């Protein structure tokens, strides 16, 4: 027996670097295409415990297994994990027939995605004495729940902001270098070609990068990975868009080595049937990909994708406004013009991405190197109303609300009669409830003006705009490069490493969008004109081009470029031992940022034009972790990491629209994270329980607002912010019977500020620091996510390829985003203590239903239907977010000074009531 085990160990070692075929038939194939699945990992537990990387067949290895009962787990990137039980008798073949792996379903919940069917699942394990069926998905049950079920409440995994998660496309980082936020919308609608994904949580090793404290997700769009197919899709919904049409074609890898793939999608909705009025949607999406297999070791691919989109935006408002209109889904951005609804806030973007990739894999499959060059370009604009020397056009402006005359007014001047009049107007007059577009046009057309410069020279005569629509642009140009290598020098050792570089230039400027019946805009700094009326130079937006008269399509107001670059080198080593997988990793990242001004401002002639100083950061990351296999079904896992992370451009520079000043002594964030997990992988039960702790220090935050007490637009820079993220999460799938599966997920967190950070306040029209102190946040809760979330669901899988499911969900302990102004010494001294306490949003409960059906018309031709109904109980009173306004109402004290009186009301948004999504797909 010892001799046999020795022979087996040697054979497994050989197999781990690519075992030759003995039968000519691959052991593991794709369930749809029938092609061999590359890089399949198998974990063997029984009398012999071993992990190995299969070649295309390993029957000769499995035939050498000693007598006994074994658990075999097969996994491959982009596929569901398959776990089987094998009873091996002495001196007999394994009896293991060809296995089919099923590609991951998009989303992982069977709701918005297509049901994938394997026709012969029931026959895969013929010849085995103890057959166990396929586990439903290799995706983590908790991540599946948090990615879809919890998203209705804007759940953020472990309380992390988007900047602590990393989104990649073919190995290229796609998080915005200016803000840190992810960029899913760049390929919105391209569901069919973005399904292949590699996901890692909490620094777990992946081939494409070092990892981050949150979730790393790499989307792969390699054309040769798509099975040969045509795919037609139609979707209908009452969410943001009403209809979606899509067509996808993939050739598969042809005999001549070429692979082609293409996809086009159309998403449309006029806002009439969307859940919130004014949320119209008009979007195209496209993808083109070609790949050539140069030889057995090298392939080259070129892809291009984009998603030109135009959509109406809804904004949060106060509960007073919702109550006045009788709906928690009121949109303050809209009003009627010519009998049609018009939205003042519109997002328009089209940022195509072109990528050239080279793939190398040696004949032994022990070395893989992927290299990608990427270029991103295009336009991204966000429209907004602008006005000067005219009444505020926003319907929910605080002076137009009944509360302005009562609780928001000086106690000595409250007017209940005026409040009653405004309440009645809100309920009866649509021109009060919504933006009065006709009135804006009327005002502009009546404003015949002659504009003169300081010397009396006439600049323009005509209808000067008092109201207008401006488009705020953030147009990015980014070149990026990344390479990663995966090397298997030994059967027990796997080394991954790589390098990447990104250089981003983002043009930030305002553009005249719609003059609303006027002829021109006089481009001056309106706040400077108010504050320095006697000095015309101060109000100049650009001293190099003074007294500009601008019209539709012209740049005005501000114009600068944010320049950022980052390069990183990283390496991981993973050790595959008999019952232990362990890894260590290290990374070094260098980041640089500077501002390039294209205007010489009258207020800041010396530090607004040209290049600023370059601010640089050098950051280190280290990580380690281990997974211990108790037996073939139960595992213990731990991960620990320390990471430094540079601040983003938007949090580094103070008022970059006007000058190149940045925060004093900027620091990188310091992130420490540790977690411990128990994982179970039984044929009938799959899941994990994790306890985690993360401490983030030296975070920086920048914000701007109108300070009523100083009657000026001001900037708040908060430095040294520390947060603590402590909690536990669990997710399980239980196969109750061959046709019934239960799933459950639970997140319990305590996400709090760990210190009282410092702040400085500056006035936008000067470099003067008007206030400097600390903010009392320690022990208060981090906002933006439910800190308690739970779901319990059942799914029935019928023998005729349909499934039906229900999920019951609970969300609690969600807090509004806190204003720092209230919690300073000044705020705590002047304001009532009740305003200092953080506001907790209402807890809530929702129920979701979903169903799917797949009909095989002929071999290789499928018609699939999906229907999802969310919040079937129509709970319309569950807030999913909110923020305290930064402005504070002031009153005049007896000594004539302005005294803080009470904060403006919190603005809230709500979970939609009952919504549906229907999807049908024809694949052939």
Positions of predicted regions on the chain:
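Short acidic/polar hinge/loop motifs at secondary-structure boundaries
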Residues: 62, 134-135, 141-145, 172-203, ...
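Short strand-turn segments of transmembrane beta-barrel domains in outer membranes
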Residues: 203-206, 218-252, 264-266, 270-278, ...
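Acidic/polar loop-and-plug regions of large Gram-negative outer-membrane beta-barrel proteins
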Residues: 299-355, 381-470, 534-552, 702-705
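Surface-exposed extracellular loop regions of Gram-negative outer-membrane beta-barrel proteins
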Residues: 312, 316-321, 539-549, 592-603, ...
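Outer-membrane beta-barrel signature, preferentially recognizing the C-terminal barrel domain
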Residues: 331-356, 612-621, 625, 633, ...
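Signature of Gram-negative outer-membrane beta-barrel scaffolds
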Residues: 468, 472, 493-631, 656, ...
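Gram-negative outer-membrane beta-barrel transporters
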Residues: 693-695, 716-821, 919-923
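C-terminal beta-signal and adjacent terminal beta-strands/loops
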Residues: 696-697, 741-742, 810-827, 853-924
